[in-house]
């Protein structure tokens, strides 16, 4: 089950797991047409998938979706929490209480609700993988990122707490830092504008491998879900070979 299944990392993770014989459940906030396209692409390659439009801000939306999947489709073996929480680059004076709270609800509270819904079920079964995506802001704040950085930092700390409680119960919690620009039209493309995004792809993406490729990221997610419990990864960071790591980078271009 993927929460945050867009055309980038989330959709490619769903596709990767379906390729291995899993039934993928894709959840996203909007764009039924885009969701249908992702499901169709999985089915055309011989996989199976279902999709739901859910707004994680709404009360009970996550909880009801998890129950529906468990009851109508089957037990959730791997949960991928890939929900974005970017509310825009805003100065402190531009960051209203409402905007600050929105970042928290998207990045941290929705993860808490997902964990509260899924992990007790995994605990009863004595197994499961719970994979969580974050960005550079989970490690380092930057001007204009008051809401996003504090919320993503909270997401990382919540992952640590979940790991401390559930790893010994057979549940693999992984915090995955994607430290770089992802070649995804519905995230980076929207942030930059389509024209600028295509220019960037021609200069840094494609054969240059300077953008993080979602299908290659998906390979890592699948590998993490299959790790032997004697050598589990808790935290991992992914970036292009040509990018400086976040601790050596002068700015955060996310």
PLM regions with names:
Residues 22-37:
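Conserved glycine-rich Rossmann-like NAD(P)H-binding loop of the short-chain dehydrogenase/reductase
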Residues 6-8:
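Conserved glycine-rich cofactor-binding loop
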Residues 93-112, 127, 131, 155:
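Catalytic Tyr-X3-Lys loop
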Residues 135:
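Residue(s) in the substrate-gating loop at a strand-loop-helix junction
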Residues 63, 84-101, 144-147:
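Conserved mid-core segment of classical short-chain dehydrogenase/reductases
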Residues 168-171, 175-179, 183, 193-254:
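C-terminal helical subdomain
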Residues 106-124, 164:
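Amphipathic alpha-helical dimer-interface segment in Rossmann-like NAD(P)H-dependent oxidoreductases
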Residues 140, 161-171:
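Active-site-adjacent segment of SDR/Rossmann-fold oxidoreductases
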